[in-house]
Amino acid sequence: MDSFCLHHYQFSSRLILGTGRYSSPSLAQQSIEASGCEIVTVAVRRFHALHAFTPLINWNRYWLLPNTAGCRTCSEAVRVALLARQLLQHLQQPHQCLIKLEVIPDPLYLLPDPLGTLKAAEILVRKGFAVLPYIYPDPVLALQLEQIGCAAVMPLASPIGSGQGIQHVHSLQLILQNARIPVIIDAGLALPSDASRVMEMGASAVLINSAIALSPSPVSMAHAMKLAVQAGRLAFLAGRMPLSSSAHASSASFGSFL
């Protein structure tokens, strides 16, 4: 499968994993391994919990993508992003500019704040960050974030952790058709078929957490997601057959029987 380029870095896997909601660090580690992912995202507020993963995960094999989950305002997200850069330096991670930006003032539905996200992204881009903003699937906002220099956009498929699957097909299609930066579908994907479908639509990658962590068999689900992402990407590259309003026989209607 072709590689995935994010801020000049190349990745062979188009599946990104979150690390929350697992019943144990060991199960998280096994799921990460089974997924074949290369990027793992961790909330900066949970960096203190990394010590539980340290004996289990070889961080030289994975890119640690910090996120600003839990931030309700622009200023709070900027402060947490700056802290994330310091933490990555302390952990001697080679990439210290990538940040997944989340500004979520709504505690019930966890929908991102478009104005706060745009403002925080502008500040962080000026400070040298490669910003990956988590957004509602708004094509206009996605374009604005691209224009200010974001490294990618991360529109949601449906609310975080809801397992509702793909609820915004048309809006996601508009973003995918017009974006010139990677589009990573984040939040709400519940099944491998969801992951495959957004990859078939042209997504650059997907970020999955709850669908794996809350599965009765997280390791098996992680492997299933890996295969689904690969299948969806191959299908996108191959191209679907043309639509037709009438039926067309796949076998010849004439000739002799053997």
From Swiss-Prot:
Q: Which residues are responsible for catalysis?
A: 100
Can you tell me where the transmembrane regions are?
A: none
Q: In which pathway does it act?
A: Cofactor biosynthesis; thiamine diphosphate biosynthesis
Q: Top-level EC class, please?
A: transferase
Record's keyword terms, sorted: Chloroplast, Plastid, Schiff base, Thiamine biosynthesis, Transferase
Query: Where is the protein found, in the record's own terms?
Result: Plastid, Chloroplast
The EC number on file is: 2.8.1.10
Residues noted as binding 1-deoxy-D-xylulose 5-phosphate in the record, renumbered to the chain: 161, 187-188, 209-210
Superkingdom classification of source: Eukaryota
Kindly state a single biological-process term from the GO annotations of this entry: thiamine diphosphate biosynthetic process
One CC-aspect GO term: chloroplast
Q: Name one GO molecular function term.
A: thiazole synthase activity
* Reaction catalysed by this enzyme: [ThiS sulfur-carrier protein]-C-terminal-Gly-aminoethanethioate + 2-iminoacetate + 1-deoxy-D-xylulose 5-phosphate = [ThiS sulfur-carrier protein]-C-terminal Gly-Gly + 2-[(2R,5Z)-2-carboxy-4-methylthiazol-5(2H)-ylidene]ethyl phosphate + 2 H2O + H(+)
Q: What does this protein's UniProt record list under function?
A: Catalyzes the rearrangement of 1-deoxy-D-xylulose 5-phosphate (DXP) to produce the thiazole phosphate moiety of thiamine. Sulfur is provided by the thiocarboxylate moiety of the carrier protein ThiS. In vitro, sulfur can be provided by H(2)S.
The annotated subunit structure for this chain is: Homotetramer. Forms heterodimers with either ThiH or ThiS.
Question: Of which family is this protein a member?
Answer: Belongs to the ThiG family.
Q: What is this protein called?
A: Thiazole synthase
Task: Give the organism the record lists.
Answer: Cyanidioschyzon merolae (strain NIES-3377 / 10D)
Gene giving rise to this polypeptide = thiG
